[in-house]
Amino acid sequence: GFTKWTEYRKGTRASKRHDDFPQTLPRSLKDAVLCFILSTAVREIRKLDQSGSKLFEPHNSMLIHISRFITWQNKTAGLVKEYLDQIIASVENDSPGDMGSIFIEFENIWNSHFSDIINNIRTYLPEGYVDPFMAPVTFSAVLPHITSAIEGIDVLAVNSSNKQKLQYPDSFPVTPLKVIAIGGNRLSRGFTMKGL
């Protein structure tokens, strides 16, 4: 442990622009990407029932605010793209019942982050709150939607160093966006991410 505040500060300072960038994504960020895919799959299951509702949001967005430094944002976008490509390859090649398959990893993420809340969703809502779309969903119901949930996910580094912009279409019928946006200041002030 640390005995002095100055020792603590030396070991926990904020990243600087020229620090070495991690060469791999931390497990927590990989898990967050898997959670985003599972959330998108759940929303796809509920889409048919919700599409007529004024609460329906067709877009699916994930925000990663890893650093205010553009170099770090761009490098993170590259690592997330690589990881997403690995997930896609695994989904295409693995069998759901195989040990070590991506589907086992999805199920583990489901059990640790989703299962209890989704199966008991009504207990988390305020008394008297009624939302017909908040129905329990099981992993076995989500499993067939994982492939379609992954299809078309874009990874964008949204900053001043590149031309990538996050723009949601206004015209109908809307082609829903699935996007993982990595950024800093461009995404932090006055920008609304839809389906976050």
Regions found by a protein language model. Give the residues of each.
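Conserved C-terminal RecA-like helicase domain
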Residues: 24, 28, 42-179
